[in-house]
Amino acid sequence: MTARILDGNALSARVRGELAERAAALADGGVQPCLAVILVGVNPASAVYVRNKVAACEKAGIRSLRFDFAADVDAAEVMAKIAELNADSAVHGVLVQLPLPKQFNEAEVLEAIRVEKDVDGFHAENVGRLSQGQEAFLPCTPHGVMKMLEAGGVPVQGAEAVVIGRSNIVGKPMAMLLTNAGATVTVTHSKTRDLAFHTRRADILVAAIGKPRFVTGDMIKPGAVVIDVGINRLTEGPDAGKLCGDVDFESAKEVASLITPVPGGVGPMTITMLLANTVESAERVARSKG
């Protein structure tokens, strides 16, 4: 068996085309979707992520605003900028790129963003709504995974799903979304005993731990759907400098029925769902204007 590849680039391009049409319709009605991005410090990876988000906004017809702060900025200055953006009716989404320098309390910063502009889906109120199965802005990576499962024709209801990783950004919300969709979900992590026992039971396996090529083919149930959220740059060996996921793609593809590659899998859909949340926020504003 050789797995079918679930192409995140192709799906992302299709969804972004639809979002561009929605953004254009909003602009014609006098509401141009707008995303404000705050970047603190000079983390190279964060800078790349922000550039990619801004570029994606431009292509989709979404206005973007970028605010850069030095790494040693007083936290109060960033909080003041968030308050300013919260009050700006022309801004529909506010995003603070993580991680933040040590002088910041990340939870306080995320809570400072108005719920209706929290297009990253990290505000506690949005997380609470998600846990209750209520309408909310969904965290972008788990939301993107669900869209990929849907596009791949994967039956989630009744499936055994295993999530490797319990982060607030991916693991926990991923488990909630799968639960809300009717899957029986197991969350595994660094303290899990006999991880492979759990992964071999999974009809749907989501890896999100940040360990390169950690999940190997012998840990996967034959015919399983494997979603690789990880993105790691190898630092040694013949593949040094290359990007890879948390799954050993070569061995996994011989066991799984469907698998996402890295790069070109979940990553593009993460940014696409950020655009989707921003457009949805703008549409809510447009509806409120009648």
Swiss-Prot record:
InterPro entries: Aminoacid_DH-like_N_sf, NAD(P)-bd_dom_sf, THF_DH/CycHdrlase, THF_DH/CycHdrlase_cat_dom, THF_DH/CycHdrlase_CS, THF_DH/CycHdrlase_NAD-bd_dom
Residues reported to bind NADP(+): 165-167, 190, 231
Known catalytic reactions: (6R)-5,10-methylene-5,6,7,8-tetrahydrofolate + NADP(+) = (6R)-5,10-methenyltetrahydrofolate + NADPH; (6R)-5,10-methenyltetrahydrofolate + H2O = (6R)-10-formyltetrahydrofolate + H(+)
A GO-annotated cellular component: cytosol
EC number, UniProt record: 1.5.1.5, 3.5.4.9
Molecular function, one GO term: methenyltetrahydrofolate cyclohydrolase activity
Keywords: Amino-acid biosynthesis, Histidine biosynthesis, Hydrolase, Methionine biosynthesis, Multifunctional enzyme, NADP, One-carbon metabolism, Oxidoreductase, Purine biosynthesis
Pathway the protein takes part in: One-carbon metabolism; tetrahydrofolate interconversion
Biological processes per GO annotation: L-histidine biosynthetic process; methionine biosynthetic process; purine nucleotide biosynthetic process; tetrahydrofolate interconversion
UniProt-listed CDD domains: NAD_bind_m-THF_DH_Cyclohyd
Pfam families reported for this sequence: THF_DHG_CYH, THF_DHG_CYH_C
Top-level taxon: Bacteria
NCBIfam families, A to Z: PRK10792.1 (NF008058), PRK14186.1 (NF010783), PRK14189.1 (NF010786)
Subunit structure, interactors included: Homodimer.
PANTHER family: C-1-TETRAHYDROFOLATE SYNTHASE, CYTOPLASMIC, C-1-TETRAHYDROFOLATE SYNTHASE, CYTOPLASMIC-RELATED
Family under the similarity heading: Belongs to the tetrahydrofolate dehydrogenase/cyclohydrolase family.
Entry function: Catalyzes the oxidation of 5,10-methylenetetrahydrofolate to 5,10-methenyltetrahydrofolate and then the hydrolysis of 5,10-methenyltetrahydrofolate to 10-formyltetrahydrofolate.
Name used for this protein in its record: Bifunctional protein FolD
Native species: Aromatoleum aromaticum (strain DSM 19018 / LMG 30748 / EbN1) (Azoarcus sp. (strain EbN1))
Phylogenetic lineage: Bacteria, Pseudomonadati, Pseudomonadota, Betaproteobacteria, Rhodocyclales
